[in-house]
C-alpha cells in the first residue's frame, strides 16, 4: 500500500506545477520511507527527507515543526499526508516559509478542515494551484482500513478528534514571493 493517497502518481502530479532544475534543493517533510526523496533524486534534485520515525537511509530523523535547516536555503518543500497528523499545520507552514528561498515552492497534499489554503496565504504564500482530492483520500482510507495497515490507528485517533467536522483532502501549490 502507498504511504500517502495517490502514491507516486500523486507525487508526480504535484511536481507538474514546478519547473524543476538540476541542483535544486528540496525537502520532503514527513518523508517516511523516502519514496518522494528517491523520485526527486532521480530527477536531478538535491533532495532531503525529514521524519520523526524515518524508515529509510534516505530520510533523516527530525521534526518538521522545528527544522534544522537554515532560513532561505530550500527551493522546494513537499509534504504529503503529514502536516495534519502533526496537529499543527500552521507551524508546519511557517517552517516551510522560513526555510524556503524567495521564489521557492510549497507542494502539499493533506487533510483539510477547510482552512488550509487560508493558513498558507496568511503565512505569506501565493496560492498557484488548489485541487480537492477528497475522493483519492477516501479510496486510500478505505484501503488502509481493509488492509489493517499502518495508518488505520492514526486515522482512528483523528476520527475521534475531528468527529463532526467535514474533512477533505486538498492539494496545494504555493510560492514564496
Where are these regions (language model features)?
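Conserved alpha-helix/loop element of class I SAM-dependent methyltransferases that forms part
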Residues: 4-22
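Class I SAM-dependent methyltransferase SAM/SAH-binding core
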Residues: 27-66
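A short acidic, Gly/Pro-enriched loop at the edge of an enzyme's catalytic core
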Residues: 65-77
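A short SAM/SAH-binding and catalytic strip from SAM-dependent methyltransferases
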Residues: 76-88
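A short glycine-rich, Lys/Arg-flanked "PGG" loop and its adjoining helix->strand segment in the class I
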Residues: 90-105
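Short alpha-helix
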Residues: 113-124
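Conserved Class I S-adenosyl-L-methionine
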Residues: 131-177
Amino acid at each position: 500500500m502507498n504511504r500517502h493517497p495517490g502514491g507516486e502518481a500523486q507525487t508526480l502530479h504535484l511536481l507538474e506545477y514546478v519547473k524543476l532544475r538540476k541542483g535544486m534543493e528540496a525537502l520532503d517533510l514527513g518523508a517516511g520511507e523516502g519514496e518522494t526523496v528517491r523520485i526527486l533524486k532521480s530527477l536531478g534534485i538535491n533532495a532531503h527527507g525529514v521524519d520523526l520515525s524515518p524508515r529509510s537511509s534516505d530520510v533523516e530523523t527530525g521534526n518538521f515543526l522545528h527544522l534544522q535547516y537554515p532560513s532561505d536555503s530550500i527551493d522546494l518543500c513537499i509534504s504529503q499526508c503529514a502536516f495534519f497528523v502533526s496537529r499543527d499545520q500552521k507551524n508546519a507552514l511557517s517552517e516551510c516559509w522560513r526555510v524556503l528561498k524567495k521564489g521557492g515552492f510549497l507542494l502539499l497534499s493533506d487533510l483539510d478542515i477547510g482552512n488550509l489554503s487560508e493558513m498558507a496565504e496568511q503565512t505569506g504564500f501565493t496560492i498557484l494551484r488548489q485541487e480537492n482530492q477528497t475522493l483519492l483520500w477516501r479510496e486510500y482510507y478505505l484501503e488502509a482500513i481493509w488492509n489493517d495497515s499502518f495508518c488505520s490507528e492514526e486515522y482512528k485517533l483523528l476520527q475521534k478528534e475531528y468527529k463532526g467536522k467535514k474533512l477533505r483532502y486538498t492539494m496545494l501549490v504555493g510560492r514564496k514571493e
